């Protein structure tokens, strides 16, 4: 789960082309502009993670650790929230990311590729397989260890920013239809991550805070039903809901999703509040929120690391889940759906490219690290999880790139000319 920042509106209500038409139509220029932004964001994300790794393995490591533990407190009257900087990033900044996810999910379901059942079938099947495969691999590696089983969801997520960054390196060898398919698959992946967080990684609940959070949610959707289009009203209520959800015991990032879903897609006077906010948030998330998250979560000391450390069942479950479970789940589910006639491959793609894409979904990175902090809040497995996620993500990215680097068949004339 990855880390998703998906495409802007590249189709209209009047015409919702499938992957083939999308790959060849004029509105694709908007998608291509976004993909350039997202690919650049993936590069920044990679740079932030690299800097964190360097700092964590240098004489500056104590300063890096002190920065993450820096206490930050906000108090308004009798309400006080005090957390180390690391948790402000994970609970606060990531709520902004999930609000963007909510905006994008709403748009895609109501107007985008997922509004059409035939277009949605293949990415839905691929995403479901891509979540089930890694989970089963992790469960197989850790069966019988009740504590370790809490981490079953860690390898189910895909970091879309990194995956798109790899596709960008391929140039014309990665057809636009393949990128659109990856984006659509990532939407379902993020929906799955949201549901997993809500159902399986919720701490003990505070009834009073939960009631207030519910009131905030009701007020958000009441604004929508009343025709309110000023996004400031939604954001203010969103902050209130975030505080209540944080205090309730449910993970606070879910407040971001709910806020995004509540903002109107269209207004009566022709404006598009959700679309406008989505466009405004894109650069902040791609070049701010996600790189900051990577910087604060990817730093892991490698001193004393031995091969035996990677053979612990938790690391094996995460690593094999991302490396093996992801590709088998995505590829297997897509192959079955194509064989039984449920869906067809995106136009201009072949099975080798689909397999390369399946490998790229094994880039868990930011979302896998994020779910890891929820599954194991204590520091007992912190370093082990980070090492497994980082190593598996790098191998998945490398293998996916090599497979897609030489698409042997099924290239379109445009691709052959471009090469």
Q: Where do the model's predicted regions map?
A:
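Structural signature of hydrophobic alpha-helical transmembrane segments
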Residues: 86-98, 146-161, 184, 202-218, ...
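Entry/N-cap segments of selected transmembrane alpha helices
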Residues: 108-135, 206-215, 302-328, 351-355, ...
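Transmembrane alpha-helices that form the ion-translocation and gating core
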Residues: 123-164, 317-375, 391, 398-406
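Predominantly late transmembrane helices and immediately cytosolic-facing juxtamembrane segments
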Residues: 4-6, 13-37, 53-57, 70, ...
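Transmembrane alpha-helix boundary signature
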Residues: 55-67, 83-86, 100-117, 132-153
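Functional cores that coordinate and move charged inorganic groups
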Residues: 167-264
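Hydrophobic alpha-helical transmembrane segments in multi-pass integral membrane proteins
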Residues: 136-137, 196-197, 246-250, 290-304, ...
């Amino acid at each position: 789960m990855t880390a998703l920042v998906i495409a802007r509106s590249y189709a209209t209500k009047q015409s919702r082309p499938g992957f083939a038409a999308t790959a060849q139509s004029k509105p694709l220029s908007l998608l291509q502009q976004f993909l350039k932004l997202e690919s650049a964001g993936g590069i920044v994300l990679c740079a932030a993670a690299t800097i964190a790794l360097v700092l964590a393995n240098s004489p500056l490591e104590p300063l890096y650790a002190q920065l993450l533990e820096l206490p930050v407190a906000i108090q308004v009257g009798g309400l006080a929230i005090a957390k180390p900087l690391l948790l402000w990033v994970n609970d606060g900044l990531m709520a902004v990311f999930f609000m963007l996810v909510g905006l994008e999910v709403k748009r895609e379901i109501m107007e985008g590729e997922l509004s059409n059942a035939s277009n949605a079938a293949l990415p839905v099947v691929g995403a479901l397989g891509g979540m089930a495969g890694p989970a089963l691999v992790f469960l197989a590696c850790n069966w019988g260890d009740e504590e370790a089983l809490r981490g079953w969801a860690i390898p189910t997520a895909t970091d879309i920013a990194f995956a798109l960054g790899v596709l960008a390196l391929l140039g014309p060898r990665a057809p636009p239809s393949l990128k659109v398919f990856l984006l659509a698959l990532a939407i379902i992946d993020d929906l799955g991550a949201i549901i997993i967080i809500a159902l399986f990684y919720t701490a003990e609940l505070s009834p009073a805070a939960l009631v207030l959070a519910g009131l905030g949610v009701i007020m958000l959707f009441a604004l929508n039903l009343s025709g309110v289009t000023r996004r400031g009203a939604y954001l203010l209520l969103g902050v209130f809901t975030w505080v209540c959800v944080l205090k309730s015991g449910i993970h606070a990032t879910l407040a971001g999703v709910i806020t995004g879903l509540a903002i109107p897609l269209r207004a009566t006077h022709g404006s598009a509040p959700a679309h406008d906010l989505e466009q405004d948030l894109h650069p902040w998330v791609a070049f701010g929120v996600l790189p900051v998250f990577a910087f604060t979560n990817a730093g892991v000391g490698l001193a004393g690391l031995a091969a035996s450390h990677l053979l612990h069942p938790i690391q094996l479950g995460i690593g094999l889940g991302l490396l093996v479970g992801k590709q088998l789940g995505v590829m297997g589910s897509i192959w079955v759906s194509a064989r039984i006639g449920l869906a067809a491959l995106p136009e201009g793609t072949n099975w080798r490219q689909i397999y390369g894409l399946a490998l790229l979904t094994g880039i868990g990175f930011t979302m896998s690290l994020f779910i890891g902090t929820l599954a194991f809040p204590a520091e007992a497995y912190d370093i082990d999880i980070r090492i497994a996620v980082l190593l598996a993500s790098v191998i998945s990215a490398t293998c996916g790139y090599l497979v897609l680097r030489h698409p042997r068949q099924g290239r379109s004339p445009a691709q052959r000319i471009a090469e």
